[in-house]
Structures are given as structure tokens and as C-alpha cells.
């Protein structure tokens, strides 16, 4: 006669012994031995797709197997995000994600997402950062952050801003700025992103926006938009005379939008480390840096997968506080 639960405890003990052995055996196998799928959460042509298509051939060259880009657009990136989170943790399904998909969506889509990126994905490395710029319509009188705040306080209820939609980081960044500055701003979302935001800004229908530099640089240079500040820690070479948000008294306001490579959370560490090393080698090549610089992207590889994973978790927590404090919710 066995005491109650003995068989169950024995079974659990066997599983506890076998799982590490299975993981060790899997990680000891050569990797990769077949093509690797690289999920992109947006349609072709955007920044996330561009970096994925630049890095994939270099990973193929380094690791000897094809890295195939697979665009899974839709649901603000959540379709690809959830596909990656639910994939087998064997290194054969990766995700190129960004600050929106991997640090913000977990809070803004909390009631509808079936996965939690901070729990269900592991970071391999940050790839690039994309500078953003705080822009204004040419017809808007202020030229600095301080002047913008002064104008807003003298004209309550008259200052509005564009974003790519509720819960996007241009929206959340402006909420953070308004709170820090003690001003009120009216949000006008454009689901078409920069394609709709730019005409609205240039016509003066809206006065302000945080938007990526690549989308606005030509309009700024042509005098159709006004650059008030940039969001990187230091001034960007393309706009050397435009001070940063930090220089104007608002450090940490405005996102340095990053793109990064992720894998399912239980992917063996040797595979994650091997991918990280390949990414570092690929993005250290001068031709890659030059190619990405032409797209106004700055190479920004992480020191280690652990560092990147921790960065994303820290940012996820910070964005969750912004979302909670401003009662931003998407059902």
C-alpha cells in the first residue's frame, strides 16, 4: 500500500530530473540546423521591417542557415507578438520587436492580450535606436520647449498634438511631457500614422507631435516643419542646432525608439548567447552601420541578452505607470 500522493510525488520528481537533462541535450545540439523564422509585427517598409531585412542576411552568413523574414501585421503588433511567445523555444522562431510591442502593449492591451511579453519572451539584443523629434507647425509661434509651455499656459485649451493612435508612444510621450510641464494638451489621434500626421502638422490643423526623425527630416530641412527638440541623449548629426529635450530641462521625456531581437522565454541560454554574438558581430561591421545610418538608425547593441531583457522589463514597468496614471485603455 502506497501512502496517498506518493506516486504523484514520484512522478513530479522524475519530471524535475528529466527536464534539465532534456534542455541540456537540446542546447548541446548544433544550432541552427534548419531555416529560422524572423517574425515582424508590421507590414513591409517600416522601420522594424527594414532592420529585420538588414540583419537577417548577416545572421544567415554567420550561422549558416537562412533567416527568413515573416511579416505578421495586425492588432498593433500583437499578432506577431503572440505567435512568437507561443512558438517552440528552440531558436527557430524569433521576433524583431520594438518599444511599442514589447514594452507598451502589455499595459495598453492588458485586457485582450493572451501573452505578457515581459514574461513570455527573452531579449537577445537591442539592434538600433531611432531618434525622435518634438516638432511643431511652422505657424506655431514658439521655438523652444520653454516657449511652448509659456504659450500653452497663456492659451489654455488651444494647444493640440497629433499621435499615431491611442496608447502609442508618441501619445504617451506627450502625456508625460504635459504632466511634467504642468500644461493641458488636446490629443488628436491619426490611425494612418505619419502619413496622416505630417499633412495635419504642415497645414497647422495640429500644432505639436513627437515623431521619428526619418519621417520628418526632409520637411524640417525644407522649412515646412519646426524642430523644437530631439529625444536622444545628445544632439543628432542631422540637426546639430536643435537642442535635446534634456538640454531644455526635460531629461527622459521623448522616446528613443528601439528595435530589438527576441525569442520565446524558455529558449536555451546557449542558443540565445549564440544569437547575441552573431548580432553583435553583424552590427559591428562598418558597412552595416553606414547602411543603417542612411535610414537614420543608430546601432545600439546590448552588452548581453540579460541586460536587454532587464531593460525591457524596466521600461515595461515605467510605461505601465504612465498608462495607469493617465487611464489609457484599449479594449
What do these predicted regions represent?
Residues 33-35, 179-183, 247, 269-331:
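An extracytoplasmic/periplasmic, membrane-proximal ligand-sensing/linker region
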Residues 47, 51, 55, 59, ...:
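Stable alpha-helical elements in mature extracytoplasmic
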Residues 100-111, 171, 176-180, 208-242:
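A ligand-binding cleft/hinge motif common to bilobed small-molecule-binding domains
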Residues 83-92, 99, 107-196, 245, ...:
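Hinge/capping helix and adjacent helix->loop/strand transition within the periplasmic-binding protein
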Residues 196-198, 237-241, 311:
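Short, charged, surface-exposed secondary-structure boundary motifs
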Amino acid at each position: 500500500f502506497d501512502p496517498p500522493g506518493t506516486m504523484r510525488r514520484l512522478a513530479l520528481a522524475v519530471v524535475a530530473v528529466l527536464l534539465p537533462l532534456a534542455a541540456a541535450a537540446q542546447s548541446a545540439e548544433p544550432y541552427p540546423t534548419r531555416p529560422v523564422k524572423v517574425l515582424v509585427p508590421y507590414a513591409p517598409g517600416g522601420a522594424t521591417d527594414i532592420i529585420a531585412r538588414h540583419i537577417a542576411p548577416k545572421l544567415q552568413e554567420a550561422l549558416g542557415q537562412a533567416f527568413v523574414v515573416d511579416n505578421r501585421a495586425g492588432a498593433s503588433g500583437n499578432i506577431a507578438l503572440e505567435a512568437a511567445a507561443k512558438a517552440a523555444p528552440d531558436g527557430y522562431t524569433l521576433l524583431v520587436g520594438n518599444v511599442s510591442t514589447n514594452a507598451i502593449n502589455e499595459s495598453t492591451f492588458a485586457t485582450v492580450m493572451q501573452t505578457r511579453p515581459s514574461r513570455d519572451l527573452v531579449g537577445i539584443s537591442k539592434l538600433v535606436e531611432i531618434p525622435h523629434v518634438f516638432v511643431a507647425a511652422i505657424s506655431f509661434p514658439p521655438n523652444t520647449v520653454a516657449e511652448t509651455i509659456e504659450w500653452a499656459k497663456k492659451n489654455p485649451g488651444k494647444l493640440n498634438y497629433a499621435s499615431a493612435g491611442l496608447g502609442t508612444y508618441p501619445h504617451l510621450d506627450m502625456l508625460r511631457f504635459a504632466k511634467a510641464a504642468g500644461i493641458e494638451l488636446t490629443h488628436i489621434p491619426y490611425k494612418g500614422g505619419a502619413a496622416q500626421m505630417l499633412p495635419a502638422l504642415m497645414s497647422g490643423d495640429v500644432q505639436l507631435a513627437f515623431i521619428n526623425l526619418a519621417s520628418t527630416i526632409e520637411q524640417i530641412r525644407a522649412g515646412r516643419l519646426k524642430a523644437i527638440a530631439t529625444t536622444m541623449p545628445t544632439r543628432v548629426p542631422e540637426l546639430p542646432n536643435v537642442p535635446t529635450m534634456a538640454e531644455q530641462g526635460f531629461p527622459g521625456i521623448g522616446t528613443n525608439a528601439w528595435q530589438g531581437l527576441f525569442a520565446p522565454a524558455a529558449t536555451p541560454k546557449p542558443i540565445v548567447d549564440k544569437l547575441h554574438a552573431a548580432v553583435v558581430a553583424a552590427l559591428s561591421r562598418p558597412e552595416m552601420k553606414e547602411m543603417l545610418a542612411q535610414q537614420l538608425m543608430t546601432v545600439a547593441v546590448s552588452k548581453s541578452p540579460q541586460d536587454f531583457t532587464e531593460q525591457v522589463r524596466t521600461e515595461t514597468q515605467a510605461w505601465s505607470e504612465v498608462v495607469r496614471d493617465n487611464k489609457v485603455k484599449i479594449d
